[in-house]
Structure formats: C-alpha cells, structure tokens
C-alpha cells in the first residue's frame, strides 16, 4: 500500500492506493508521502477538481465493501457533477426501492469520498444527512466557497 497526505481547500486528505487502484481517501493526515504514479494521478485529478477544471475522475478504484455497498458506490459514480439524488432515488436506481436506510449506511461507509461522490446524496427533505463529522465540516467549508458538488 502507498499513502500520501495532500493539502486541499477542504483540509488535509490522505490518499491510499495499492499497485493497481485507489483504495481509500480519508480526512486528516497520516504524514506519509509515498512515491507512486497512481497517487500522483489521484493528487493531480483532485487538485483539478478543487480548482474547478475537472468534473469527473478517471482513476482505477478498488473500494472494499459488500456486494450491496459496491452497487451503491457504482450508482453514486453515475450521479452527474452538480446534481443530487435522495437516498430513496438511489435505492430505486439499484433495484432496491425499500432500502434507502441501507443505501445511507453504504454512503456513510464510502471509503473513497469525493471521487465516489457520496456528497451528492441528500435526505428526502433536501438536506445533507448521514455524513461523518469530518465530511460535514469539509462540506460546509466547500459550500462556503460557492463550489457545486
């Protein structure tokens, strides 16, 4: 595993990759600065995204999770930049219309936030809900800069 911490407009992010794919993005630092072409690409694409010059990512990803979580995370990647979906809409999109709470849990456990855009899912009442504390802080900073998700 290779790990690198980068500074971004929403705070420090730690990127993790194996030999073939990005496996995690975490809020905060672990101090590692490993050399890796894949981490170079991930860092460059994240910088472009935060600068507003990139709307999609073309990185190889390998999030670890259950088959259900994998389906949710694949559906998250299909939500276009600047758009949102409710948990119920996402549940219906994966063929499990009564599983909005389970979708919320999969969203909460997304190991590669930003690239797998869990921030584009909102509650039925239109509010951001169910996100980890670190993301909530970063999301409010991001919104204060006027950036769409």
Where are these regions (language model features)?
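Helix-turn-helix DNA-binding helix
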Residues: 100-103
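Basic nucleic-acid-binding alpha-helical/helix-turn surface characteristic of O6-alkylguanine DNA
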Residues: 1-98, 146-149
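Short Lys/Arg-enriched helix C-cap and helix-to-coil transition segments
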Residues: 114-121
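Terminal helix-turn-helix DNA-binding modules in bacterial transcription factors
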Residues: 109-113
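…primarily DNA-binding HTH/wHTH and HhH modules…
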Residues: 124-149
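Active-site and channel-lining beta-strand-loop segments
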Residues: 13, 121-123
């Amino acid at each position: 595993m290779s790990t690198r911490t980068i500074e971004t407009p929403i705070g420090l992010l730690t990127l993790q990759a194996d030999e073939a794919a990005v496996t995690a993005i975490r809020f905060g630092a672990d101090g590692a600065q490993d050399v890796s072409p894949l981490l170079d690409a991930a860092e460059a694409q994240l910088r472009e995204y935060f600068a507003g010059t990139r709307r999609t990512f073309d990185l190889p990803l390998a999030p670890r999770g259950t088959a259900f979580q994998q389906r949710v995370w694949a559906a998250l990647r299909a939500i276009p930049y600047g758009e949102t979906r409710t948990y119920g809409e996402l549940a219906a999109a994966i063929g499990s219309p009564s599983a909005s709470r389970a979708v919320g849990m999969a969203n909460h456990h997304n190991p590669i936030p930003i690239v797998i855009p869990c921030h584009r899912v909102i509650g039925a009442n239109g509010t951001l809900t169910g996100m980890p504390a670190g993301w909530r802080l970063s999301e409010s900073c991001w919104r204060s800069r006027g950036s769409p998700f």
